[in-house]
């Protein structure tokens, strides 16, 4: 009986990590400070940056995929660790 209980405890602890949710920076400042919890299906953090009107624009957040299209001077960076899109 003790073996069964120990097995159930170990399995429960192992399964608790399955609900892990990624966090990514989500603000548009040069030095990001706020984060968001990504939905379960979001595997990437992204950072888009481009120059518009002589000013650098930045967009950050969570993404399903990692877009690799770079056009019109737009720089796109993707990563898979928490808060890696600073």
From Swiss-Prot:
SUPFAM superfamilies: Snake toxin-like. The keyword Signal applies. Expressed by the venom gland. Pfam families: Toxin_cobra-type. Belongs to the three-finger toxin family. Short-chain subfamily. Orphan group IX sub-subfamily. Its main location: secreted. This is Candiduxin-2. The keyword Transcription regulation does not apply. It is found in: Secreted. Disulfide bonds join 24-45, 38-62, 66-78, 79-84. GO terms for cellular component: extracellular region. Residues 1-21 form the signal peptide. InterPro entries: Snake_3FTx, Snake_toxin-like_sf, Snake_toxin_con_site, Toxin_cobra-type. GO terms for molecular function: toxin activity. Keywords: Disulfide bond, Secreted, Signal, Toxin.
């Amino acid at each position: 009986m003790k073996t069964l209980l120990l097995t159930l405890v170990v399995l429960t602890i192992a399964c608790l990590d399955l609900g892990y949710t990624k966090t990514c920076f989500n603000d548009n400042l040069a030095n990001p400070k706020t984060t968001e919890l990504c939905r379960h299906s979001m595997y990437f953090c992204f950072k888009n940056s481009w120059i518009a009107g002589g000013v650098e624009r930045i967009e950050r957040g969570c993404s399903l995929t990692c877009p690799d299209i770079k056009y019109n001077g737009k720089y796109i960076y993707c990563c898979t660790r928490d808060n890696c899109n600073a």
